[in-house]
């Protein structure tokens, strides 16, 4: 046994925890030393971190930090040995180490060489090992296993605090003034776990060949070339780890005509199966298969086959088990469901041909009336237009059957989405992304021609709006309680705007759309954690009121930050004519206080940097890193095991103690109507949407689930995500974690 080395490790524990807390731990440590008298430090650290995890339970939740401290000691010892320095000097040499890693192709050379050696040395001095004490064991292990830089032998060459600094350095390398201070501010925000960036940024910032955006949405054109071009674009994004939403509502239905030949089309299902194959085969260098959500309108003739795509029975030739599905629902359909009236299904190609318009290209501008229901009724009344008739409630039953068996389809409430779209002057929003929180203008990229010029094949396509999501989230339980929102949010908005400039997207129309709208998605996580710390029950008016007040504050600070950034960098190119410019964004939401009027005036006069600003993603994996609860979701259990393919780690609810335990009620026992009320309160302050899950028992009756959907629609939810039943396991999009 190396007494000196163990003394250092033990001394750190004694400084961080009381003797009473570690009484059982020291007893187990003594037993280990007796059994391994020649045991080395690394073996002791490994063995005792496992013992600490075994001691973790609801009465002793602090053992996750004991295990994290021991694991962190192992990491520092390993990296210090590699760098040939003492553990206490491991961060001091990071500036020189960064140059070596860039020379080896492990860091992006353009990032490192954009800073002088003097600047690298200064930034290295900011690295604060004590902030590792904020990590739970599962949080630290997740960060190390999945995100810190490793060499070509998969050995760790970067420590957690250095990952935070590299993200800050990467995202601010093109800043023209006060660059180091902006890097330092971003490092402060990240290392204190006040915020996280999206997982692609977390994983790829500062590394070669990595893209930084989270999710994408494509609109498929109704042509053979358009369908295959879209599939190729999806594949090119999927290989970099992006989660993708695909809107198929413009593609003609089964039995539609092709070039005048009747009953020639095979409909959307075969093309969705092609996307399913893409998701499975383009598997991100073997790490995990791609993630694609396909959306279809509820009036599309193929909707019933679409709803059966993920079912476990029936004709396998009509199944796509690896695709996630979403339905686009107008107000009129929900009204027909509630009234138990008939619903009509149409072929979008036939509607375009006979009616001279596309039904999907319009919506109800006002509740209860508008262009969509007028045109829908015209289609119903046109006897020349073929149509299928089915009770609306029967379609809803099919939806709910699929949801209870598979968790999907997601719901996209298209009328409310487009009524609240701040950029309706430039287009339509047809669907959402993989996690239902991103809602931005969309349009199909159209093939124009292929020619040979100078013995080179040249293909021309007219670019559509191919949506890109750039995400970051606030850790509510830390940032709100520490009172740092006013300092934090401008840092986040600047970082997100910088991602737009730095990102190297493989799809040109996506790059174009990103620059036209400069859309970002600032969100939150740790909501249940915050409620528990504030001693507020989930099922209470106090929780609803807090959601309203807090998200109005976050919205104000986010809009203010983007408006201030516009004064420095200019507005997004499509600002003129937007709700932002005209001031209707503020009046629609009843923002009439003095500070809101002043902000409205500022935006109208000097603009806003980002056309879309807020979105609440699922962010389950980054919430694990930050040691808090995911998104706006309640916890599953107070104690559970986080299972990955190669390990199983016990976890307790964050900051679980005799005071907070009473406020951690399991998701499956919470009245979901209170969840809807909370989200109605926050949704009015969020210009995009929220990944809103329903948690239900597998014994739920159809009428109860229907009541949830109807209330969500009536409360002006823009979307709902999974229906999570106790009988099914579901997978979140890692890319949307932020």
Residues covered by each model-derived region:
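Terminal amphipathic helices with adjacent charged low-complexity linkers/tails
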Residues: 63-102, 141, 329, 417-448, ...
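Function-dense linear segments that define catalytic or interfacial modules
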Residues: 149, 155, 162-179, 183, ...
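Catalytic alpha/beta core of large soluble enzyme barrels
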Residues: 119-122, 132-142, 436-440, 496, ...
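Alpha-helix capping and helix-loop boundary segments enriched in small/acidic/polar residues
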Residues: 4, 155-158, 177-181, 200-208, ...
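Core nucleic-acid recognition elements
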Residues: 1-165, 181-187
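Internal maturation/activation junctions in enzymes
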Residues: 231, 489-511, 537-619
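Conserved catalytic alpha/beta cores of large enzymes that bind or transform nucleotide phosphates
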Residues: 265-273, 280-393, 397, 401, ...
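A glycine-rich phosphate-binding loop feature that marks nucleotide/adenosyl-phosphate handling sites
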Residues: 49-52, 67-73, 189, 203-207, ...
């Amino acid at each position: 046994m190396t007494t000196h080395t163990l003394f250092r490790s033990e001394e750190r524990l004694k400084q961080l925890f009381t003797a009473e807390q570690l009484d059982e731990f020291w007893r187990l440590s003594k037993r280990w030393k007796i059994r391994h008298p020649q045991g080395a430090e690394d073996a002791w650290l490994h063995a005792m971190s496992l013992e600490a995890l075994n001691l973790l339970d609801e009465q002793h939740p602090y053992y996750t930090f004991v295990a994290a401290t021991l694991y962190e000691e192992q990491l520092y010892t390993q990296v210090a040995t590699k760098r040939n320095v003492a553990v206490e000097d491991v961060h001091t040499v990071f500036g020189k180490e960064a140059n070596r890693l860039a020379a080896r192709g492990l860091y992006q050379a353009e990032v490192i060489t954009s800073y002088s050696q003097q600047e690298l040395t200064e930034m290295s001095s900011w690295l604060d090992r004590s902030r590792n004490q904020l990590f739970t064991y599962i949080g630290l292990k997740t960060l190390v296993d999945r995100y810190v830089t490793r060499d070509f032998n998969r050995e760790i060459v970067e420590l957690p605090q250095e990952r935070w600094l590299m993200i800050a350095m990467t995202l601010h390398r093109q800043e023209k003034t006060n660059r180091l201070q902006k890097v330092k501010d971003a490092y402060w925000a990240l290392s204190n776990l006040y915020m996280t960036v999206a997982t692609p940024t977390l994983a790829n910032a500062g590394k070669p060949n990595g893209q930084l955006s989270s999710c994408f949405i494509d609109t498929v054109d109704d042509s053979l070339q358009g369908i295959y071009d879209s599939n190729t674009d999806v594949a090119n994004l999927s290989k970099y780890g992006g989660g993708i939403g695909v809107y198929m509502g413009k593609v003609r239905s089964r039995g539609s005509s092709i070039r005048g030949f009747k009953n020639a089309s095979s409909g959307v299902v075969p093309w969705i199966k092609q996307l399913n194959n893409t998701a499975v085969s383009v598997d991100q260098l073997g790490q995990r298969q791609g993630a694609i959500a396909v959306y279809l309108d509820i009036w599309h003739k193929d909707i019933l086959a679409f709803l059966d795509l993920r079912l476990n029975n029936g004709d396998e030739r009509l199944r796509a088990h690896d695709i996630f599905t979403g339905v686009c629902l107008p107000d009129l359909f929900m009204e027909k469901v509630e009234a138990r009236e008939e619903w009509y299904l149409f072929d979008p190609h036939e509607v375009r041909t006979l009616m001279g318009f596309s039904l999907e290209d319009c919506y109800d501008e006002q509740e209860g009336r508008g262009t969509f229901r007028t045109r829908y009724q015209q289609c119903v009344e046109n006897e020349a237009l073929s149509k299928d008739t089915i009770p609306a409630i029967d379609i809803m039953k099919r939806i709910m059957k699929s949801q209870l068996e598979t968790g999907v389809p997601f719901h996209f409430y298209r009328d409310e989405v487009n009524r609240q779209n701040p950029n309706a002057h430039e287009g339509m929003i047809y669907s959402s992304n993989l996690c239902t929180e991103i809602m931005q203008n969309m349009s199909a990229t159209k093939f124009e021609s292929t020619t040979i010029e100078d013995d080179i094949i040249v293909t021309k396509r007219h670019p559509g709006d191919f949506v890109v999501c750039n995400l970051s989230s606030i850790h509510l339980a830390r940032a709100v309680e520490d009172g740092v929102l006013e300092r934090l949010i401008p840092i986040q908005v600047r970082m997100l705007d910088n991602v737009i400039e730095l990102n190297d997207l493989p799809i040109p129309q996506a790059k174009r759309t990103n620059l036209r709208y400069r859309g970002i998605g600032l969100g939150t996580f740790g909501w249940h954690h915050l409620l528990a710390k504030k001693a507020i029950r989930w099922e209470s008016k106090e929780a609803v009121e807090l959601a309203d007040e807090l998200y109005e504050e976050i919205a104000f600070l986010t809009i203010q930050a983007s408006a201030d950034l516009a004064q420095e960098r200019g507005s997004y190119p499509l600002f003129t004519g937007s709700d932002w410019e005209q001031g209707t964004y503020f009046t629609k939401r009843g923002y009439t206080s003095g500070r809101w009027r002043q902000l409205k005036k500022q935006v109208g006069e000097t603009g806003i940097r980002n056309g879309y600003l807020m979105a609440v993603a699922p962010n389950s994996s980054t919430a694990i890193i930050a040691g808090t609860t995911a998104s706006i979701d309640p916890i599953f259990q107070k104690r559970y095991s986080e299972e990955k393919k190669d390990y199983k780690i016990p976890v307790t609810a964050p900051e679980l103690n005799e005071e907070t335990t009473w406020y951690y009620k399991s998701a499956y026992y919470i009245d979901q109507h209170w969840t809807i009320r909370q989200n109605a309160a926050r949704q009015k302050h969020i210009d995009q949407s929220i990944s809103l899950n329903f948690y239900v028992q597998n014994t739920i009756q159809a009428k109860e689930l229907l009541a949830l959907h109807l209330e969500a629609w009536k409360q002006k939810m823009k979307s709902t995500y999974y229906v999570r039943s106790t009988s099914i396991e579901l997978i979140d999009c890692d890319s949307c974690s932020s």
